């Protein structure tokens, strides 16, 4: 599908309960380390932490397709319950998502 951008707007835990499974190499993984998920090899190549979101860059590879670079933008300021009180950060995050998605790439996965 030529997806180049994944957006995540939930945290892994909500009220200390698992809400989302981590589908990328862990934060304790050193950049450049690779983990296998089914047929896919995922290498974490870059992590940038900002006030209210994290940008992770991965190389995805399997034996049947060319390697691809995928960027994940993870909004980390969503409250456990309800919605953000101030939309400013969320709107800024949306702008960052749009800017991060390369031209002529496939759909953004949310």
Swiss-Prot record:
STY 3 and STY 6 may represent a double domain transmembrane protein tyrosine phosphatase. GO terms for molecular function: protein tyrosine phosphatase activity. Keywords: Hydrolase, Protein phosphatase. Belongs to the protein-tyrosine phosphatase family. Substrate binds at residue 80. Pfam families: Y_phosphatase (PF00102). The keyword Acyltransferase does not apply. Residues 1-110 form the Tyrosine-protein phosphatase domain. The keyword Ribonucleoprotein does not apply. This is Tyrosine-protein phosphatase 3. Its EC number is 3.1.3.48. It catalyses: O-phospho-L-tyrosyl-[protein] + H2O = L-tyrosyl-[protein] + phosphate.
